[in-house]
């Protein structure tokens, strides 16, 4: 199941079924990471530039990927499972929240009204660079759609002259010269990238405080996950006794370690 650590042995085969639950994508993580040459401190693949990963391309049948050596902690996590209520993801059918930005005045009032009242469809042209939507045309003011190129953050809602929203994703360019009406909040971004071509999308307004609150919620979920991971290892593999002097005796796999702790 998801959110679970599984110990694999030589010859084991992992299989996946179709999309189920909250989205169409899942993540398979390897303790120790993948053992491939990093590019700019990353082992990810950027297919457009043909760099990173395995020869800068998508994986294909027959590829062999070496796995790095996991740390001692990860070796003890067989059977560990995170509770599903730890997932901060929002309702997959909820409207996506947009924090409007400085270029909002480049759009007419009618255009902005249409954006937040209309339903859009994700097109088949969507990729890791951007999610292209089709629906009601968003009208610009006399200023037009072109601007002096500026930075494009993750989740920016860019609207070129054709009036169709494009939400910028992980492989987006660093700068662009089209107007951006705003940016999605963190949890709305997570919901968006789980959608498939043909999925319906609606939007609502949000403010900066909501985006900050979502980011804090994600950070708290990560903190709790780490805490539960350590608790699992401590409960299943470690025995410890403590003296009143701040001195610890820690026993791990039969080996005894003397530890002194001082509060600072």
What are these regions (language model features)?
Residues 1-264:
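Conserved "landmark" site that anchors the functional core of diverse proteins
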